[in-house]
Amino acid sequence: MRTEAKSINFASNTPTLSGTLPLTVAQDFGFFGAESLEVKTVLIRGGPTAMAALVGGGVDYTLVAGVAAVRAIAQNAPMQIISGLQPYMDYTLLGAKNIHSVNDLKGKVVGVTGPGGIAEFAAVEGLAKKGLVRDRDYKILYGVGNSPSRAQALESGKIQASPFSFLERLELEKKGFPILFDIGSAIPGFPFVVIVTSKQKIENDPEEIVGVLRAIQRGLEFLKRNREKVADGIIKKNKFGDPATVRQVINQFAEVYSVSLQKSDVEALIGATRIEAEAKKLGGTEKFYTLQFLTKATEQK
């Protein structure tokens, strides 16, 4: 057992409470400390950039959209998925104020941050489940920017719908933007966020990986049983909005997080990313993930 805490960096794509809560709980309530780890969360916007930092050694692990992870691995990025984290697609499609239903989007424009991102996937797949086909029924517009920019684009009429996270949705609902549908419910059980590390880390520090996953798993169990205690700790930091919002986020996500990962989850990601042919060439689903560390971490509770 290491006596001095080892410092490791975790990249996260989002500064939101829902995006970082599993790491915050594991750090603040001593679960990383019990593994002699000191974890710093580094905000890196965009999955591809976060994974480039991982490959370059700037960070040790990254929380990233599952579809972005399998796409990078299919392009020979030297990394693997080591765990699930959030098997729930945290997106709701919100409309401009003159849009009242999904069918009102026919002939309209849906705005997303950029090509190949999870927001684009969420919007296109979610609308497909509702019977609307991209390019036939509506257009996708890239480069609409972050949440405030997308809300502004809805207001100005540049776009007529856009996907927003739970936290963003709470804010925009107050401003009168209509909810068209919850994408997470339309695409259930999808490995939305996963944990990825480099092949170098897998080869050189297997014990650390087991410790990281065990700490996160214990933190998630603690969160489920101690929502109010976690909420109080987060509220004291005064970083994530008003107490009511913090509690709403914790109640929404406490039961959702799970480190669980199965072959079928990775197959769903490969199918969603439409890279079945590339996956086959690379040697199949096993190329994309490893369960050896998760198995050890969850055995040693």
What function would you assign to each model-found segment?
Residues T273-K301:
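Conserved C-terminal helix/tail region of periplasmic/extracytoplasmic solute-binding proteins
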Residues R2-V144, R150-S156, Q160-F166, F177-G189:
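Short, glycine-/small- and polar/acidic-enriched structural segments
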